[in-house]
Each structure stands twice: as C-alpha cells, then as structure tokens.
Amino acid sequence: MTRYEIEPRNRVRQLAEKAHYDHDSVHGVLDAGLVSQVAFSQGDQPFIVPMIYGRQGQTLYLHGARKARLVRLLAANPKVCVHVTLLDGIVLARSTFSSSMNYRSVSVFGSPELVDDPAEKEAALRVISEQVMPGRWAEVRPSTDRE
C-alpha cells in the first residue's frame, strides 16, 4: 500500500489512530468531494476561499478565472493548503458533550501553477467538470476559445 510521507505539518495529533495516509484513503476523500477550501497568505494577511477542483493522479486542478484577483494571488504564492471535508454523519447523544460528527478530511500542501497551454486547460477543465458533474462533459458542446 502506497502512503504519503508523514511530516510535522500533516501528522494528525489528536485521535491519531483514526488517521490514514495511504493513497486510496486520501484519494477517496478528494474524489468524493465537490468543494475545497484553499488557504494562502498575502503579506501578513491569511485568506481561505472555496474553490471547485478535480484530481488527476497526483495533480489537483483548481478552477478560477485567469483574470480574477484570487487566481493571480494564488499564482504568486509559493505555498497553499487545499482542504476537503466530507461530513459522513452527525452523532446525537444524550448530552451535547457526547455528541459529535463523523467526517473525513484531507489537507494537501503544495505550490500552485497556472495552466497556460490550451490543450492542458481543456483537459484540466474536463477533470474538474467530471469531479463535480460526472458524465456531463460528454453531453455538452465543446468549449469555445473565448470561454
């Protein structure tokens, strides 16, 4: 079983026995999610924004308009954290202290890169579209150059 390296920044400390670092578990969460939270900083100001995404192999594609301020900020930041959470259930107990949530989550650390090549852009858009709307890519007309 292939695993991601455990480092100080990704090591689960509380309830560590529930943590999984194998590719199947991590990719399973990423493949089931629809929206990610992307965290980065500009100067001394932290930001976190929701973005749709798609995974292909070891690459995460984030969707954003090239002219958007956010995309320019991400491209200028050498480090980001992409987080995805899946809520599996709410556990109701006889006390609020014993109530909880069952969830799975993944934090991915990396450096964003703009996709400039038109063919790679289309391939990335297909990956993102299939993440959010499986099978829809085959049902719609091709994108135009302007789009």
Feature-to-residue mapping (PLM):
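Generic beta-strand structural signal
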Residues: 36, 78-82, 104-111
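Charged, gly/pro-rich active-site loop segments
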Residues: 1-17, 89-147
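A short mixed-secondary-structure module that forms the rim of ligand-binding clefts
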Residues: 52-90
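A generic structural micro-feature
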Residues: 45, 74, 100-104
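Catalytic micro-motifs at enzyme active sites that drive phosphoryl/nucleotidyl and oxygen chemistry
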Residues: 40-42, 70, 94-97
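Short, intrinsically disordered, mixed-charge
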Residues: 31-32, 75-80, 126-134
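An N-terminal domain-cap segment
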Residues: 4-61
